[in-house]
């Protein structure tokens, strides 16, 4: 039975075993997926194969800056207890280092790249990590910035990770500026970086909502169109302040009063240079992953029935 590269990828996702071993298993089993899983188990990878079927919805997001490169990764495990363990945290940091050092195009490329301080690939290292850490592990996503200046921030032990990219001039150290921007992003999760990014469709929808609300308000319904338009403009400014990073009120009012945009300009000027916000990525660990809801009563009943 023939098999494809997609089959190798599927088997790797099912078992967390290295790509080469998965390919070998499919060759040995003539492309039969079930037999390939059993073959891998027989070769001593049973623990990793069994754990790979579990839902990994906990974990950690981690940001790293190294040698001018910034990397942000999310790695998932099964339990919050595991996510706080030293072994898991060290593994996540190694994955971030692998991203920074290897410049992989995607997760598949990352899995086939060299694991830090090892002759093995990330994929080849995974089974041992799954067994030593004791849970299913999934490298979910990453981003890498190789240009400009990157600053990372990790909130609440890795529940949220942010990587900010800045264009810095004047030879200044913009780390503190970047960290404060990252904290703002972590706390408020803006939809847009700047109001210039808000599309016409979004603006039209917001204006439509504002006008509809006025039409349902007896005090506003009969106001002249010009008055309504001014009110709508005021609401749009409020929309920018609530949804666009640069137009937001800077959260650290203890060090600056004003918008994020003004804070960046003011802080850079005081340092004798200039800073321009380029891009950022925010990961909230486990977002979008459906967690398994345990029914312990049903589980016990099932186990009792199995014993009959």
Set out the residue ranges of the language-model regions.
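N-terminal assembly/interaction segments in proteins that build large macromolecular machines
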Residues: 2-308
């Amino acid at each position: 039975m023939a098999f494809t590269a997609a089959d190798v990828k599927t088997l790797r996702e099912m078992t967390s075993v290295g790509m080469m071993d998965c390919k070998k298993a499919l060759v040995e089993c003539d492309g039969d997926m079930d037999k390939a899983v059993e073959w891998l188990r027989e070769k001593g990878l049973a623990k990793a194969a069994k754990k790979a079927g579990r839902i990994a919805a906990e974990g950690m997001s981690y940001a790293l800056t190294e040698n001018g490169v910034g990397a942000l990764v999310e790695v998932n495990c099964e339990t919050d207890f595991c996510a706080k363990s030293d072994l898991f945290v060290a593994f996540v940091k190694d994955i971030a280092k692998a991203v920074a050092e290897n410049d992989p195009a995607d997760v598949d490329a990352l899995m086939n790249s060299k694991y830090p301080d090892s002759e093995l690939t990330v994929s080849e290292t995974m089974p041992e990590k799954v067994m030593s850490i004791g849970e299913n592990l999934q490298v979910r996503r990453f981003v890498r910035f190789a240009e400009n200046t990157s600053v990372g921030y990790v909130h609440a032990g890795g529940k949220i990770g942010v990587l900010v990219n800045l264009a810095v001039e004047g030879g200044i150290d913009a780390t503190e500026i970047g960290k404060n921007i990252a904290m703002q992003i972590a706390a408020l999760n803006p939809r847009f970086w700047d109001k210039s990014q808000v599309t016409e469709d979004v603006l039209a929808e917001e204006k439509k909502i504002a006008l509809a609300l006025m039409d349902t308000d007896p005090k506003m319904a009969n106001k002249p169109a010009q008055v309504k338009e001014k009110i709508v403009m005021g609401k749009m400014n409020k929309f920018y302040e609530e949804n666009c990073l640069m137009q937001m009120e800077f959260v650290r009012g203890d060090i600056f009063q004003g918008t994020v945009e003004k804070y960046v300009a003011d802080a850079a000027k005081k340092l004798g240079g200039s800073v321009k916000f380029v891009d950022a990525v925010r990961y909230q660990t486990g977002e979008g992953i459906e967690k398994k809801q345990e029914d312990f009563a049903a589980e016990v009943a099932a186990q009792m029935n199995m014993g009959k």
